[in-house]
Amino acid sequence: MMWVAVDVMSGDYGPEKIIEGAVNAVNQDGANVVLVGKEEEIGEILLKFEYDTNKVRIQHASEIIDMNDSPSIAVRTLQDSSIVQATQIVADKTCVGMFSPGNTGATMASALLYLGRIPGVLRPPIAAPIPQENGPPMLLVDAGANVDCKPDYLAQFAVMGEIYSKLIFNILNPKVGILSNGEEDKKGNTVSLKAFEMIKKLPINFVGNVEGRDLYGSGKDVDVVVCDGFIGNIVLKATEGLSKSIFNVLRESIKQSSLAQTGALLLKPTLGAIKKRLDYAEYGGALLLGVDGICLIGHGSSNALAVQSAIRVAVECAQHQINDRIAADLKKYNI
């Protein structure tokens, strides 16, 4: 039986929506969850829901790591925080994975400190799904864990991202590219050019350099895009901001006339489908690849759907033994 630890205390809006998502995962997906946080508060919220009590446990954690806390200090001094407690019950194999919508740096630091790295992994990256016009999402690796990278880090990111795309998104032969300032082989900086030479020697479906427009299905077809965490995090936040801006502009435009409002009513099912396709909550969170346990990091604003989706991904990663695949391929490719 696979259990997933859920940090219910660290989100922006309190524990109720996170607990709702966890209960939905139990009721709709058959998941088993350990809710990590203040036991009394969790118990009171659970009274609002119906669920199989054999599939929900509570792990008491009296402390909370704030978004403004120093990650490296917090994970050592706040040992009874929900982030640290969730990590530790993955480390002791009580749970196969964890999800936290809290301080990203603290979640990463806790995972590195208590779970450690998979043998052979140089630097664990964050793998973030980017919704596409059609089909499964594109995977952005690294989306913020490592702001400074060496070429061999990027080569490992390519391998880990390819495995994730195969196992979780069911893409048979994922196309892998390096994010660059042009698609020509000689475009890029010193690190990306050296990484290009390393990755093209690997037995993966490498399509070379890709440009920013390729991330959204408007150019070269690509499933995994590799970059350092500095660029990746900017891309991720810009993508999220642009998506919200487009829908806000559309909403305001509809308000301008009765004709537009009538048209919007006719298009409501289509607009709803588009919004669902572009909603990050459909994918739950970003996986911290390369740590010796499944660790998903969510938005502070994660809603119930995002939590449910993250729990589903955690279980799928464990079922597919993604970490064993990563260790085996890195060893086989000698990188």
UniProtKB/Swiss-Prot annotation:
One of its GO terms (cellular component) is cytoplasm. This is Phosphate acyltransferase. It comes from Leptospira interrogans serogroup Icterohaemorrhagiae serovar Lai (strain 56601). One of its GO terms (biological process) is phospholipid biosynthetic process. It is found in: Cytoplasm. NCBIfam families: plsX (TIGR00182). Its main location: cytoplasm. It is an enzyme of class 2 (transferase). Transmembrane segments: none annotated. Catalyzes the reversible formation of acyl-phosphate (acyl-PO(4)) from acyl-[acyl-carrier-protein] (acyl-ACP). This enzyme utilizes acyl-ACP as fatty acyl donor, but not acyl-CoA. It catalyses: a fatty acyl-[ACP] + phosphate = an acyl phosphate + holo-[ACP]. Pfam families: FA_synthesis. Keywords: Cytoplasm, Lipid biosynthesis, Lipid metabolism, Phospholipid biosynthesis, Phospholipid metabolism, Transferase. HAMAP family: PlsX. InterPro entries: FA_synthesis (IPR003664), Phospholipid_synth_PlsX-like (IPR012281). One of its GO terms (molecular function) is phosphate:acyl-[acyl carrier protein] acyltransferase activity. Disulfide bonds: none annotated. Homodimer. Probably interacts with PlsY. Its EC number is 2.3.1.274. Pathway: Lipid metabolism; phospholipid metabolism. Belongs to the PlsX family.
